[in-house]
Amino acid sequence: MAARAAVQAAAAATKGKKIIRHKMKEDVKMAELSPMMKQYLRIKSENEDSILFFRVGDFYEMFFDDAKKASDELDLTLTGKDCGMEERAPMCGIPYHSCESYIARLVEKGYKVAICEQVEDPKTAKKLVDRDIIRVITPGTVIEDAMLDEGKNNYLAAIALTEDGVGLCFTDASTGECHLTSFPADNYNSAVSDELLRFAPREILAADSLKAKSAALWEFLQENFKAAVTLRPNDAFDPKKTEELFVKHFGISELEDRGIDKTSSKAAALGAVIGYLYETGRTGSISVNKIDVYTDKQFMRLDMTALRNLELTETMRTKSKRGSLLWVLDRTKTAMGKRLIRSWLEKPLLNITEINLRQNAIEELCDDTIMRAEITEQLSGVRDIERIMTKVVYKTASARDLLAISATAHSFPAIKNLLAGAKCRMLREICGGIDPVEEIVTLIDDAINPEAPVSVREGDIIKGGYNEEVDFIRGDMSSGNSFLTDIENREKERTGIKTLKVRFNKVFGYYIEVTNSFLDKVPADYIRKQTLTNCERFITEELKEIERRVLSAKDRIEQLEFEIFDGIREKVAAELKRFQATASALATLDTLCSLAGVAVNNRYCRPLVNNSGNIIIKSGRHPVVEQVIKTPFVANDTTLNMKDDRCAIITGPNMAGKSTYMRQTAIIVLMAQIGCFVPADSAEIGLCDAIFTRVGASDDLAAGQSTFMVEMSEVAEILKNATKHSLLILDEIGRGTSTFDGMSIARAVLEYVADKKTLGAKALFSTHYHELTAMENELQGVKNYNVAVKKRGDDITFLRRIVPGGADGSYGIEVAKLSGIPETVIRRAKQMLKKTEEEGVVTYRTVENPDMQLPLEMQGAQDILHDLQTIDVNTLTPIEAMQTLFEMVTKAKSI
C-alpha cells in the first residue's frame, strides 16, 4: 500500500511539468542536471546494454529510455522526476524488497538488469550518497531461486572460433559446473548445433566477428534459439587473456594442468565465460570450479529431431514434463538429483565400463530395499547446496541460507553410514565423496540465530553468547527498553492518566499517547507532536534522550552483526570445493536411487550392454505409454543385428501401434546406455553411437517449408550423419508427396540405409507402401514385420503385436470407420476401392536387370536416360542423391 501511494504521489507531482519523451543522449544537457541525475547518467553510460535499477531510498528507480522500456514490459506507471531541467525525466519505480519478480520478468524477456545500490549509509553521507553497480543480472548469470527452475540447469554458453576449430563452453553460474569441448574447423556446424540443443543455454556469448567468420552458424543461432545472443569484443576470446583469468581464478599458471591447450578454442571459450562472470558478478569471485572437458565420442548423438520425437524431457504437444520419459524416471528427492537425471537422459554413454558401474549401483539398490528406503528418507531433507553455495560465494546468501547448509550437512554422517557397507565401486566412491564438513556445521550452529530474519542488515542474526560485544550492546538496549516501562508507570502515577502509553514508530520515534478523555491532565512539559481522532501524541526531552541512546545502539549492533555474519559467510565460501564435491556425490546417489526405485516398481530388467551390434529385446514395453493407458500394455520383441536383421520394414494400419513400437525400441536403447534398467523381460543392447528419428508430419510455415520439405530435410541430415553403429527410426518416408514419388524415395532411402556399401545401419522402417516388402528377397539384411490385426466382417481389432511378414492389407477404410467417419462416406470409399481393384492397380516392380533398356519413347526421355547413365553413384552424398532425384522427377513430369 505504501509503495502504491508513493507512486501515486509521484504521478500527481508530474502535473504541470512536461516529461522528456526523447532519447536522453540527444536531449539531456548535463550542465543543467541535478547532482543525482548526473550520477545516474555517468553510471548508465557504463552499462548501456542493461536496464539500470537505481536505488533511491526504498525504491529502485529507472529513468529516461530505461523507464519507458520497464513501464512497457512490467506494466508500471510511467511518471516523471525533477532532474534539474525544465522538463521532468521519465521515471518509473519498484519497491526494493519486491524487485526479484520484476527482474525475473525482464530477464525472461532477454534483458540485462544492472543493480545500482547505495554503497554508503545515507545517514552518514555528507553530500550525494555514493552509488555503484553491485551486479549485472543476465539470462545466463541468474543465481536467484525465484528466477530459476530447481530441476533444470541454467546454462551460459560461449562459442569461440579459432584457426583450429570451434570451442564450446557451457557453464551454470548458479551451480558452478562447467562443460568444455571443441570440434575441428572442417566440419563443426552440425556438431555445434547438437551440443547447443542438448544444453539449451539461456544466453550465448559470441565474438563480434562471428557473423563474418561463419554466416551459417550465426543464422542457426538466430533462427533456432530463444536464447539471448550477447556479442562480446573479439579480445574477450583471446587465449592469452584466458590464461590470465585462469591464473586469477584457479591459482595455477598453466591451462594444461586441466588438460586444456592454452592456445586452443576450448581455452578461448572458457576464458570468455569466466571473464563475463567476473564482469557481471562484481564480487571478485565466482563459483566455477568443476570443469568437465569432454568429447562428442563420450556420448550418444541425439539431434534436435530425436530429442523432440522421443519426448525425453517434455512432450511434443504440451511441452510439459508429464508424459515424457523424465516424468517416468524422475523420483529424485533433491533439486541436484533432478538436474542430474535430466542430464543423464540427454547424454547417454558410449563407454561400457561407465554403463556397468551405474548398472551395478542400481542393482545393489534394487536388491537392498531397506538401504534404499533409508537413503531416500535422508535425501528428502537435503537442500540445494549447489545453488546455496553459489549465493554464498556471490555474497547474496542470507543467514537462513547458512542455516539450510547446516541442516543439510547434519544428514551427511547418516548417509555415509548407510553406504559404509556398499559392495559396488560406484556406491563406495559416493560414500567417500560425501564430506561431513563438521567444522562448518559447528560454526553455523554456534553463531547463527535459528530464528534469523531474511535481511542480513537488520540485526538479530547472531546467536546470543557467540560474541561478547553483541551481547553487551543487546544488554544496553534491553535496559533502555525496560527503562521505557519504568517511565510509562511513573508518568501514569504522576499524571493520573491510567491509559497513558509509551510507544514507538519509525516516523516519530518514542512518544507518549494520551486518549482524548484525559487531555486535560496532560502536564506542561509534554510537547504535542501529533493529533489523531481519538488521542494525541506527545514527546519529552527525557524520551528523546533515551531514543538517541537506543537507536544509536541499534545502528551499532546491526552493523556489528552484519560484519560478523559476513566473516562467517566468507569462511563457508572458502570451502566451496568441498561442498561442490559433496553435492555431486549426493546428486548421483539420488539419481541412482530414483532409477532403482522405478526399476523395482515397474518391473524393469538389467540389460546386457556390449559391442555386439545386436538389439535383442524380449517383451519390450514403452515406459511412458504403459503408465498412462488403462489397459494392459502389449509387449513386443525386437531383433536387430548387423547381419540378416539390420532393417525391419514394418507395415500395418494407422493407429495399430507402429510408431509406439519404434519409439519404444529407441527409448529402451537409450535407457540402457544411461545405465538404467529397461522395461522388458530381457535385453541385449549393442552400443549405438546415435539415434536418429524421422517420425510424424509437421510444417515449418515460418521457414516456408512444407511437410514434405521438412521430412526430406530431416532424412537428408540423417543420411549425412548416421554411421553403421547408429539406430534409425524412419516412419512413413515419402508420404508427403505423390504415391510414385514417395514410393521411389522410400525405396531409395531404405536401400541406402540397408546396404553395407553405403551405410549398413540398424533401422526400423515403417511404411504404407506394401510394394516395399518385396525388398526382403532382394536386399540382404532386410526383414518384414507387421502389426497383427484381427478382422471380423467389416470390423477390425488391433492386437498391437509385431509379427514377422508383411501386412495383408492397409485397412485404411476400417481405420476411418473406427475414427468416426460418417457411414455414407465409408460406403462410398468401399465402392471406390472395389472399382479400383477391378480395373487393376499399378504395382511396384523391381528392376532385376539394371542394364535393360527402358521403353522411354516420349519426347525428352533421352535426356533423362543420359542423366541416369552419367551418374556416378559412388561419389554422390545422400543429400546430392536426393536433389538429383528431385530434379529428374521434375523433368519427367514436364514431358
Residue ranges and their predicted role:
Residues 17, 25-364, 377-380, 384-393, ...:
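Charged catalytic and DNA/RNA-contacting regions of genome-maintenance
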Residues 505, 869-895:
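Terminal-proximal interaction/regulatory segments of ATP-powered molecular machines
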Residues 64-67, 263, 333-334, 339, ...:
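ATPase nucleotide-binding head domains, primarily ABC-like/P-loop NTPase cores
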Residues 116, 139-148, 284, 420-426, ...:
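Active-site phosphate-binding and catalytic loops of NTP-dependent enzymes
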Residues 394, 398, 408-411, 464-465, ...:
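Charged, surface-exposed helical/loop "interaction arms" that form contiguous linear patches used
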